[in-house]
Amino acid sequence: RVIDSKGCRDIGKLTEVEKSLDRERGIFVIRNKLRNSAGRRKLGVLWLVLDPVAMSLVYLFVLTVVRSYPGIESLFIGISMFRILQASFMTGVNSIQDFTGGLISERVRSRVLVSAALRYRVLETTFQSSAISVILLFGLGVNLRAVLAFIILSQIMGILAEGVGLNMSKLVRRIPDLSNLIRYFMLLMFFGSPALYPMATTTGLHYKINEYNPFSYFVESVRYLADLESVIFNL
């Protein structure tokens, strides 16, 4: 086994026993991540499902009070997709703080950790998008094509965001103060991105900046397929 700055790996072919152990380790890592997400909360993993719904309802109330109501479908799509983006990115940033994957007795192969991280990202994103998908389809009458696009694009966006965060994780581990700057940046990005409102409502420099914002392409695509106000073909 070789452990260096590039990761933890073995030279040569793995035996069937080692492959079986890697699969079991991967499953353990995923379960450990779910336990960490649940914490000591009684609803546990269910909060992954409820969080996007709760946040959407909070901002729906706030925007209704200030008379800046963008449409409930557009708001639910925007906020839930940004929550997925944010969670995925921050998971990637914090991903290499622990090379054991929760297995204290040894360091797990990097391949196992990456595979487990990918599967967990798909699982968590499925949890996060499930309740919103049901609300969009059955509660708000959004067409099935748009709901499927919402689920698929959320998965793709989540994987890409975690990958970007993973690439930044070594730098953040070396300079811990960057984690605070990243949190401020994500907060700024939340209010600056077309999450609370369609991009069509932005003008000037605000619109121009969002043309270079990857999130805009994902969320505006879903809004277009949902027959909502969208500028996807102008980007």
Where are these regions (language model features)?
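Hydrophobic transmembrane alpha-helices and immediately adjacent juxtamembrane helices
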Residues: 1-235
